[in-house]
Amino acid sequence: MNKKNTYIMLSDSKFLEDEVCHEGVKNIIKPFSRVVCIPFACSPKFLFEKSDKEFSCGGDFYKQHYRHFEQYDVSDFYIINPSDPIGFIEWKIDHCDIIYLSGGNMEELKHMLKSFGLWRKIKKIESKIFIAESAGALVLQDEYIVFKNDIPFRRDGLDMVDIVNIFVHYDKEKHEDLFREFKILSDCTCKQSFVYAVSNNGGLIVEGNKVTKVGEVYD
């Protein structure tokens, strides 16, 4: 793991708007920070057919995701558009303090990062803040587990966070047994030491070997 970065791992980035989250991360997301959103977990149809409209300042996607950061007084909020020249995409990443991986599909996110030559670039980033939602949070991990039709699959991620393995969108009433199975599988198949269930109203802050729970997080 790159211990020089700080990682905020969420199930739902809307939690950033919650007072509980704000109190937990306000000393990390500092005023005048510059944020770049990498939306590559979205469907290809959305990315390649609607991005010009949705990612502009007046677009619904832009407004929805910028809203998460408004109370932190960030100075700039960019979204990487797949139609951007690669040099401009890399400039946005280099120029910003915060890399925000929005949610969607893990495999699409990995495919797009590799297709645009960003997989290795992101792995080399140091001294930045990563905020990752759902699919983004899973892909940051060394390894992650997903369930499809109640069948578990282990997948490889970016290997930027190698001490936690998270179960996203956890609902205590619905997922208690599944999380128990998840923990057993994680202990057997993944190298991460700590396993957490993160609800839509919770998140983890990972700084080196220090893990801080914010909101509704279970272990």
Model features per residue range: what roles?
Residues 110-129, 136-219:
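Active-site-adjacent pocket-lining segments in enzyme domains
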Residues 101-103, 112, 133:
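Short His-Asn-centered micro-motif
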